[in-house]
């Protein structure tokens, strides 16, 4: 968590001190953890659960459960889950870095990424629900 705090603070300082960097570029780099937490809180409130209690409905957990259907080794599933998420985010970072000063482009990319996340979340949730 401390590395994330320092990274986020550094990115915000870079955007504040450099007029060429859109603040939405920083938002693009930080959207996933923020959205995951917000989405989790909303999901728990909707299901009448405490927002502070853990649950097993996070995107990475659903992806892990999905991969369990293909590989029986927990280490492979865990590694693949991390690799898939990191690869997606790495590709996304390269895409949003193409035009880091264009605010409209950055807002469009945040929106697209949230749509992609939500789409795959719903798909994984349905697949996992039918397997259980």
Predicted segments, located by residue:
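Alpha-helical transmembrane segments
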Residues: 1-132
């Amino acid at each position: 968590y401390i590395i994330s705090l320092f990274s986020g603070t550094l990115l915000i300082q870079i955007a504040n001190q450099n007029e060429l960097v859109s603040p939405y570029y920083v938002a693009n780099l930080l959207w996933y953890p923020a959205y995951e937490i917000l989405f989790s809180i909303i999901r728990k409130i909707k299901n009448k659960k405490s927002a502070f209690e853990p649950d097993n409905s996070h995107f990475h957990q659903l992806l892990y459960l999905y991969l369990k259907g293909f590989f029986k080794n927990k280490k492979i599933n865990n590694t693949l889950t991390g690799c898939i998420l990191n690869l997606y985010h790495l590709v996304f970072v390269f895409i949003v870095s193409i035009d880091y000063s264009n605010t409209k482009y950055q807002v469009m990319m945040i929106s697209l990424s949230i749509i992609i996340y939500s789409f795959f979340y719903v798909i994984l949730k349905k697949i996992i629900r039918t397997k259980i």
